[in-house]
């Protein structure tokens, strides 16, 4: 399967902000963007005025990188959001946030979305008591996500849980760290999500 193999820290520098792709490193002073907050490459420090199209494209790339999707995957999510009732941009973010790998990450079962995706693929996650190994599966309100019994002793999962305890869990989730399980209480409202994302630029880009 195709995947983005670009170094994660370079991806953050390319977008000019932390995308939280490397787990705990993103919360430490070791994060490269703290020292080099400019795009990578020979001419990275040059200031360039972007066209409207370039701004829209950069925002789409940023959101894709945050959620770890390839272009075709992201476009398919957008098409689904566009067909739903309501505001397309809000629908888009709700669909992205409802992915099983993203929910597992937000519950603290993986230190990053990419690690959470691996955990899902390796049959370490149960959804409503049944094995679930498709990262793109959309979780519904009321669904119960938990770590499979055989995976509860994995060191990387334990480390992720300890790190998650030091951070706040999104309000639309409820997590039992002792039993490694969590409840997807409701779909997040736009006001609950990151204000650094401008999904309207993606809508403008794909509407052309």
Curated annotation (Swiss-Prot):
Disulfide bonds: none annotated. SUPFAM superfamilies: Alpha-L RNA-binding motif (SSF55174). GO terms for biological process: ribosomal small subunit biogenesis; translation. GO terms for molecular function: rRNA binding; structural constituent of ribosome. Keywords: Ribonucleoprotein, Ribosomal protein, RNA-binding, rRNA-binding. One of its GO terms (cellular component) is small ribosomal subunit. It holds the Pfam family Ribosomal_S4. Residues 98-159 form the S4 RNA-binding domain. SMART domains: Ribosomal_S4, S4. The keyword RNA-binding applies. Part of the 30S ribosomal subunit. Contacts protein S5. The interaction surface between S4 and S5 is involved in control of translational fidelity. Belongs to the universal ribosomal protein uS4 family. One of the primary rRNA binding proteins, it binds directly to 16S rRNA where it nucleates assembly of the body of the 30S subunit. This is Small ribosomal subunit protein uS4A.
């Amino acid at each position: 399967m195709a995947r983005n193999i670009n170094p994660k820290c370079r991806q953050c520098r390319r977008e000019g902000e932390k995308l939280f792709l490397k787990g705990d490193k993103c919360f430490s002073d070791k994060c490269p963007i703290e020292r080099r907050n400019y795009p990578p490459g020979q001419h990275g420090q040059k200031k360039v005025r972007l066209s409207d199209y370039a701004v829209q494209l950069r925002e789409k790339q940023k959101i894709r990188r945050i959620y770890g999707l390839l272009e075709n995957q992201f476009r398919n999510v957008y098409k689904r959001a566009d067909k739903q009732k309501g505001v397309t941009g809000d629908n888009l973010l709700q669909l992205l946030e409802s992915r099983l790998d993203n929910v597992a990450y937000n519950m603290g079962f993986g230190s990053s979305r990419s690690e959470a995706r691996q955990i899902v693929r390796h049959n370490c996650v149960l959804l409503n008591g049944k094995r679930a190994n498709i990262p793109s599966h959309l979780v519904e309100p009321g669904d119960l996500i938990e770590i499979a019994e055989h995976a509860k002793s994995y060191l990387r999962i334990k480390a992720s849980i300890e790190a998650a305890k030091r951070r706040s869990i999104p309000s639309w989730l409820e997590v039992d760290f002792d039993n490694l399980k969590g409840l997807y209480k409701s779909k997040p409202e736009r006001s609950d999500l990151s204000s650094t994302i401008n999904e309207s630029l993606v809508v403008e880009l794909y509407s052309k």
